[in-house]
Amino acid sequence: MKLFNKLFQGDKVIWMVVILLALSSLLAVYSATGTFANTKHHGSNTFVLLSHAAKILVGLGAVYIAHLSKYTYYSRLLWLFFFISIPLLIYTLIGGSDINEAQRTISVFGLISFQSSDFAKVALIGYIARELTLRQDNIKDFKTAFVPLMLPVLAIVALIFPENFSTAGILFASSMVLLFVGRINMKYLMTFFAIVFVAMTMYILIVMNFATDKGRTGVWVQRVVSYVESFKDDETKDAEEIAKQENEEDFQIIQSKIAVASGGIIGKGPGRSTQRNFLPHPYSDFVYAIILEEYGLVGGIFILLLYMILLFRAVAIMAARPQSFGGFLAFGLAFMIVMQAMINMGVAVGLLPVTGQPLPMISMGGSSMLMTGFAIGIIISVSKDINNKEKGDELTTTQDNN
């Protein structure tokens, strides 16, 4: 036990959450990749399993390495990452590789590809946490606090927005919550939110009504329309409308709902999913639907609780480090991860339109696994510092009593 505590420092509950998410990922993705293996790897599920296991190990390695450093080290590192992320995002927009008709990845020598937005998300949260800490004395001031904090948020979100609306939305919402927690003037935040909302609405209206090539905006609008249409009673739809539906976005929604409904309370059992053969991307965007089908409501609630525990532990860390870089950083990263998880799960059960967001630490995907692991490692690093301080205080108290 002493060796374990020495090797794995920090919040043991978060460590347990990470390990359980990794094991859940291995089981769910292996089961969900049957059709993918047949079409891409000549039916070799073993290859897919080993490939995904390697990505999980990379993610866990990122957690472990990140947790070793003192969290204050990330103040300068993430500040540097923020300025690196801006040219990376610009390059992604101009020359990024296409994934699902969107330029989201950067390819390095044709061998390795990663999503620059995953890198930028962690960098921006770190930048905000640093600046919030430095500006606490004048945090209510418009010029010295609000403007210097909002401009970086606007820059990163604007660069992600054209090709990845859902990621931009998650990052914007997470940033706004973190700024609220950091005591930025609520009046300024609400005004800024209203301006961004109006600007986004005008942008969508202009593109949809006047642009020849609607690009990703057309995809977003179609997803929302398909989502709304999915709630209509079948009796109100004619045969042509139903046929059209089945060839578009809500085919995914329909198949996901079938997976969820067929899972029941305890599920069909590991490896017994049938909807993995019909769902597009059952190993990434809709992996939660496969979990619900095979492990039922019990399995779904278990995964949900893991993410909620992560958020609660981050809130506890922030409470132990109020108005400090470590507290802001841990909470901001955890909130962003959990919000992404909630959106993925909401899509899988039909509560939200299709977004394309992976389930953190579970869905198959190298860059997402790496950067999520890095973010969780930073959270553990903050908790490690708190634990060390508490042990030091206990030792000092004991010595004083003696």
Locations of the language-model features?
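Interfacial segments of multi-pass membrane proteins
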Residues: 132, 174-188, 273-299, 356-373
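Loop-to-helix entry and N-terminal half of a specific, functionally important transmembrane alpha helix
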Residues: 315-356, 362
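Alpha-helical transmembrane segments of multi-pass membrane proteins, especially transporters
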Residues: 144, 148, 192, 328-336
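Hydrophobic alpha-helical segments of polytopic membrane proteins
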Residues: 79-80, 86, 145-159, 165-212, ...
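Hydrophobic, glycine- and aromatic-enriched re-entrant/interface helices and adjoining loop segments
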Residues: 99-100, 105, 191-297, 324-325
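Hydrophobic alpha-helical transmembrane segments
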Residues: 54-59, 294-311
